[in-house]
């Protein structure tokens, strides 16, 4: 495969990502398009009622000596965090996925962390298979090699970008194994 052919999918992917970023609607615009826009939870009456009910239930359970997930202080702390979230008319917090940076802790940070961990595990598996001596290493795991690959997998973006640009990330068809059916 020539170097020019390997750059075509990368260029198309980059163009697609840039197009999505340019066409991405902001949260402010999305808020004007809904029937009942979200409000801060502390300003929603249904949320206040729910908060009162849960605090009273936590107090009662703690007084009765029942096991609870959150004691009264933990429940108060949970609802203090929810006070800054956005709620609908139902009183329940909603997850904001519009890309607003002030809500990055709700969705953006966990999703990027998930993708990074998934990429690290995939890259570690790829490294392990590349360094394996055959099917024996796949059946009986070589633990020192696996740990080394897992640690190297943590910096997978640094390793993946040069391979993606150079085209080394693609494996020839004859090296792709097909599992028995």
From Swiss-Prot:
Q: Which residues cross the membrane?
A: 104-124
The protein's UniProt keywords, in alphabetical order, are: Cell inner membrane, Cell membrane, Membrane, Photosynthesis, Photosystem I, Signal, Transmembrane, Transmembrane helix
Coiled-coil ranges per UniProt: none
Main subcellular location? membrane
Protein localization: Cell inner membrane
Signal sequence span is 1-30
Protein name per Swiss-Prot or TrEMBL: Photosystem I reaction center subunit III
- Organism from which the protein derives: Gloeobacter violaceus (strain ATCC 29082 / PCC 7421)
């Amino acid at each position: 495969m020539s170097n020019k052919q390997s750059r075509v999918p990368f260029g198309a992917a980059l163009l697609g990502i840039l197009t999505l970023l340019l066409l991405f609607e902001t949260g402010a615009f999305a808020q004007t398009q809904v029937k009942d826009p979200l409000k801060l939870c502390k300003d929603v009456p249904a949320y206040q009622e729910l908060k009162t009910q849960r605090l009273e239930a936590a107090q009662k359970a703690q007084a009765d000596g029942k096991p609870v997930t959150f004691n009264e202080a933990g429940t108060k702390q949970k609802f203090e965090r929810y006070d800054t979230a956005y709620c609908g008319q139902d009183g329940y917090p909603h997850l904001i996925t519009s890309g607003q940076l002030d809500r990055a802790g709700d969705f953006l940070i966990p999703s990027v962390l998930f993708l990074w961990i998934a990429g690290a595990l995939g890259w570690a598996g790829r490294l392990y298979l590349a360094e394996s001596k055959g099917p024996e290493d796949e059946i009986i795991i070589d633990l020192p090699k696996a740990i080394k690959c897992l640690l190297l997998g943590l910096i997978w973006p640094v390793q993946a970008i040069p391979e993606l640009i150079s085209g080394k990330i693609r494996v020839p068809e004859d090296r792709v194994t097909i599992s028995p059916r």
